[in-house]
Amino acid sequence: QFAEDVVPWDERRFGLGQGLRPQLINFVKGNRVRVSGVTLLHSPFWVIHPLLCKNVTVDGVKIWNEGPNGDGCDPEACENVLIQNTHFHTGDDCIAIKSGRNNDGRMWNKPSRNIIIRNCVMEDGHGGIVIGSEISGGCKNVYAEDCTMDSPHLDRVLRIKTNNCRGGRIENINMRRVKVGQCKEAVVKINLDYEPEEPCYRGFEPEVRDVNVEDVTCRKSAYGVLIVGRDSVENVSDIRLKDCVFNGIGRENVRITGKTRNVKFDNVMMNGSLVLASEDRPYKSMAQWMTYSEMKRTPKSYLLDFASKPRWNYAVGIELEGLLDTYRVHGDDSILNYLHTYRQKMIDERGDVVGYDYNAFNLDNVRPAKFILRMQQYGARKGEKIALKIFMKQLLNQPRTREGVFWHKAIYANQVWLDGIFMGLPFYCDYAVKNCSPRKARRILDDAVNQMMQTDRRTYDEKTGLWKHAWDETHRQFWANPLTGQSRHTWARALGWYVMAMTECLDVMPDDYPRKAEVVALLQKVMKAVVQYQDKKSGVWYDVLDVESPKNYLESTASCMFAYVLLKGSRMGWLDTDFNEAGKRAYEGILKRFIRVNKDRTISLTDCCSVSGLGPGKGPFVPAGKENYKRDGSFDYYMSEPIRDNDAKGIGPFIWASLEMERLNAQ
């Protein structure tokens, strides 16, 4: 307050009992000042404080000061400063560069400048190298290099803190070749709103520009880069990070609020992901970015999903449908040609499908037919029409439970899986609406609705409010509860298949179809439960929904499915607007937790469960010796299945969720 009121320094009297603490070493207006080869302990306040000095050297000093406000070395309004070979263990900032607080700094008008910091070790403290907050006179030309920092109590590595009480320009700040074990908050933090409740005269907007951080590594932190700019002025600019690797980031790689300009990342990896400023991304659309990433990773569409040879596969069909929807929104014939390649490779002019076995009565094999059905609008082929009829014939002859629900496969006799509802019913409904008479289409839609409702009745678990992965009509499968026939747990992706099946069937049901409301009501029931199991911290979902265990993990494919259904369902009016907020939270969680930017500027979807299933156990169509008792539906079984990147079963739903977010953001 004395400074704000322009009280001369020699008239500033604080009086008895104010508890003012002196610095241990305080040089004022000195020249050629040197502190070297000493150990400094337990200062009441800052340890070394050169004020308005020139040509200062601190060399080979050991500082141990754990008290409050126990800064190690604070050059204030100084020029030509060298701090090297010094070990800091402090209760506050290790090095804090200053240039006067508020009006004092503005009256002095002496920026701290030409400061070199090298070969130092920083432990504990609020910051390793800090500029501010008493920085009203400005600061420029700081070079920090070849330092090491490592402590769970060290809050930040490079910190710039100021506010509009201080003002001042901070520029040309450089850090390189710094190795950090861990820090508590952020590797780099720039804060122009430090202590926003401080009583002072305001209106002195600070400016931070030309900050360069190169070859800095950190193994653990909460944030990589944390920038708090001003909302009223664009006073943070030209911030560049190059060749840095920050791992073990617990909260967010980069968080920027307020107005900034030209924040750049050049070969910066955080948590294994290449960091790009928004303007440097190759595509603004995440759907396009993922589509082109997959096309680059797998130039031949019939080898998607890690195939070594062409295969008729439900996961590939789902991904190709996602790519098709990217094409429908954004265009580009290269995508369309990529899609054509699959259909041309897999179905010949006679209607023969590579690898398809009608007699397996495998619902998974029906799913890619929906992609082929949708592609008819981009050129129909005779062989495809024949093949589509064969797939419809399979469904019409598919073995069923006594209640009329499709068996999942012949080898899974008498079993209803949530997965199978998605594999069979959307094509069943779509083909009927497009190719059958209205009366026959109505019968097929009724059949599909009945199957969804029976599946709900047989797999729903009142105890958890969730749906089990599968149900065995005989109650005799080794994985089935002998009383209910249900499997043990709710596998998130299985429930994702179930709700996506409802969504896709609703898409093709005519508005005047009287049982459409039943499907909407079921979708609402399931998604209400899904949202209750959404992880509050991350916004995404665990692989097994009904188990709380450290072994459980947040899983991406199911999270993409749920995000997509929440966003689309609310847009279509099938779900209330509250579900839209849950969908946005889920999508943001997916981007933060599961999307990795690779060095080649492609993106990947991480933490995908490769596969999970049940059995088969003994059955009428299971060859002897082909039983799989490992797949017993236990939690440990689900946790034993491999986790991988870029599983097609997640890529398609991620693209769909991304396109829904684009629609939402365009409103």
Label the model's feature ranges.
Residues 73-77, 81, 90-91, 445-506:
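Loop-centered beta-sheet repeat module
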Residues 3-15, 22, 385-423:
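Asp-box/WD-like beta-propeller blade repeats and closely related beta-sheet repeat scaffolds
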Residues 285-303, 337-355, 386-405, 445-471, ...:
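Long, well-ordered core segments of solenoidal/helical folds
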Residues 24, 30, 34-52, 405-471, ...:
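Aromatic- and glycine-enriched pocket-lining scaffold segments that form the walls
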Residues 255, 279-281, 285-317, 329-337, ...:
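CBM-like carbohydrate-recognition segments
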Residues 499-546:
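Oxyanion-binding "anion nests"
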Residues 330, 431-443, 505-517, 569-577:
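Inter-helical turn/loop segments and adjacent helix faces that build the functional surface
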Residues 1-278:
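Extracellular/periplasmic carbohydrate-active domains that bind, remodel
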